């Protein structure tokens, strides 16, 4: 009888990536097949996020539902992973004694052993350590699930912004070696992936070891990824302004595979608030980066993160944020009301902004961003945009859907053989959350592919030394 696994995931794209790796790993080691129905599962895993308010209570609410399933099936294994698990550790079992496994983002690769241990003597397992980059060495080979794929290139963050729990829950920055990353991407390209999204909590801080022992920069890595045949688009998230160096901007100037869209969090337009947040940059320095980026890539569109109602934020501080939004002309944002995260310096600050004022500021900010986003979309009306076709439209199975370089969803009429390929689409209609278009050119008319296949890239780039150890050969 097939054993089944159910994973519930909250939070960032890194968590989504981690959950996919858990599924692949437990399929490879135990033959677990994913199910969307928790009641069918032999193992339930909750991959948590601690960024937002009441994250812990959300976890225990979900666990309460799963407790009922365990009462019906005592052999059911329940595991809690992610950032709340890393933050709370053994405290989770104090409130939910029926949880069998507690693991952190850096120990998910040990899940097979943890499950075996629980199956053996029913003793609970708690492992929330930070074993450097070990987890990537233990994960199975990547498996493509469409024309786009996420690839984690580094973990953790050293910035210690006063409001953020990431350094405490995912550890400090650790970068994967460049040859490991490139080999994974080449494998994905061989399976039909056309676009990769490089992931990291502070992705542009990547400083990975090269095959010859030297240390590569993020700009170096972007150029190497762009050289892999079959990879026609590169995205990355999330970056930090303090690490956004001129050599990265030069890649935007020289490398068409890097898309004309960037998510670069700023959080506030007030230098005083930025200082309280521990951001280590000013609003002017942020705008200087954007100015240089647009000089290198005039059509680039920028999204960002904002926190409103940070302790001590005055009306004047908020107005400076609104001015920055207008000056940069952001295309979209992830914006939130400040909520203190336990264990962070900001949790000890006086939360002196009234709740109603926070809500009003958030509404004003989001309305302005929405207006700017619609203005950007209207400029695209009548233009021809290159779309990577990801599948059928959510609105109609009779239509296809894909994304532009600047991350706009476009729905259009097409044929199934277009899925996984590029098409050029003329934009005919603009809506708040999507665009509509008609196909004017198929990939066969573009000449994108080169004669060399992704398989030959793997063969060319993966060499072995005298001991049989693989390394990357550019």
From Swiss-Prot:
[4Fe-4S] cluster 1 binds at residues 12, 49, 83. Transmembrane segments: none annotated. Its main location: cytoplasm. Residues 3-120 form the MTTase N-terminal domain. Binds 2 [4Fe-4S] clusters. One cluster is coordinated with 3 cysteines and an exchangeable S-adenosyl-L-methionine. [4Fe-4S] cluster 2 binds at residues 157, 161, 164. It catalyses: N(6)-dimethylallyladenosine(37) in tRNA + (sulfur carrier)-SH + AH2 + 2 S-adenosyl-L-methionine = 2-methylsulfanyl-N(6)-dimethylallyladenosine(37) in tRNA + (sulfur carrier)-H + 5'-deoxyadenosine + L-methionine + A + S-adenosyl-L-homocysteine + 2 H(+). Keywords: 4Fe-4S, Cytoplasm, Iron, Iron-sulfur, Metal-binding, S-adenosyl-L-methionine, Transferase, tRNA processing. Residues 378-441 form the TRAM domain. InterPro entries: Elp3/MiaA/NifB-like_rSAM (IPR006638), Methylthiotransferase (IPR005839), Methylthiotransferase_CS (IPR020612), Methylthiotransferase_N (IPR013848), Methylthiotransferase_N_sf (IPR038135), MiaB_methiolase (IPR006463), rSAM (IPR007197), rSAM_horseshoe (IPR023404). It is found in: Cytoplasm. Its cofactor is [4Fe-4S] cluster. GO terms for cellular component: cytosol. It holds the Pfam family Radical_SAM. One of its GO terms (molecular function) is metal ion binding. Residues 143-375 form the Radical SAM core domain. Catalyzes the methylthiolation of N6-(dimethylallyl)adenosine (i(6)A), leading to the formation of 2-methylthio-N6-(dimethylallyl)adenosine (ms(2)i(6)A) at position 37 in tRNAs that read codons beginning with uridine. Monomer. Belongs to the methylthiotransferase family. MiaB subfamily. PANTHER family: CDK5 REGULATORY SUBUNIT-ASSOCIATED PROTEIN 1, MITOCHONDRIAL TRNA METHYLTHIOTRANSFERASE CDK5RAP1. This is tRNA-2-methylthio-N(6)-dimethylallyladenosine synthase. The gene is miaB.
